[in-house]
Curated annotation (Swiss-Prot):
Organism annotation: Pectobacterium carotovorum subsp. carotovorum
Record PTM text: Cleaved by prepilin peptidase. Methylated by prepilin peptidase at the amino group of the N-terminal methionine once the leader sequence is cleaved by prepilin peptidase.
Role, per record: Component of the type II secretion system required for the energy-dependent secretion of extracellular factors such as proteases and toxins from the periplasm. Part of the pseudopilus tip complex that is critical for the recognition and binding of secretion substrates.
PROSITE patterns: PROKAR_NTER_METHYL (PS00409)
InterPro entries, sorted: N_methyl_site, Pilin-like, T2SS_GspI_C, T2SS_protein-GspI
SUPFAM superfamilies recorded: Pili subunits (SSF54523)
GO biological process: protein secretion by the type II secretion system
Keyword Cell inner membrane included in the entry's annotation: yes
Topology class, membrane: Single-pass membrane protein
Protein name (record): Type II secretion system protein I
Membrane is among the record's keywords: yes
Family, similarity comment: Belongs to the GSP I family.
Localization annotation: Cell inner membrane
């Protein structure tokens, strides 16, 4: 009996199936990473918008109000919706300042949320 060299058709089909499945897995992983990177960029920008609102309030030397103050701004080519409010602390000279930022005005969860403390001068 003569020994055959090469692969049978079944072996070739199995090998192609394995490579196809591996390729699909790589594509799915790449797509997820791209989506995660986009979300990370959005959350970073939202954090910067929140920090900018805190700085703006300090520069204006405004005492934070107890009710939500709302507004919107352009940053990194995107429209951001922000809101902030002052929260009473145990010290009448100090308030907590909560800032929330969203890309979608009606979104329940904020893309970024920061708290800092403001001292009356």
């Amino acid at each position: 009996m003569r020994r055959q060299k090469g692969m049978t058709l079944v072996e070739v089909l199995v090998a192609l199936s394995v490579f196809a499945l591996a390729g699909i897995a790589v594509l799915q992983t790449t797509a997820r990473q791209a989506s995660s990177l986009s979300r990370l960029e959005e959350k970073t920008f939202a954090g910067w918008v929140a920090e900018n609102q805190q700085v703006q309030l300090r520069l204006e030397q405004r005492w934070p109000e107890a009710s939500w103050v709302r507004g919107e701004t352009q940053f990194a080519g995107l429209r951001w919706h922000w809101r902030w409010q002052g929260v009473e602390t145990g010290d009448p000279q100090t308030k907590a300042l909560d800032v929330e930022v969203r890309r979608n005005k009606d979104a329940f969860a904020a893309d970024a949320s920061l708290r800092t403390y403001v001292v009356k001068q």
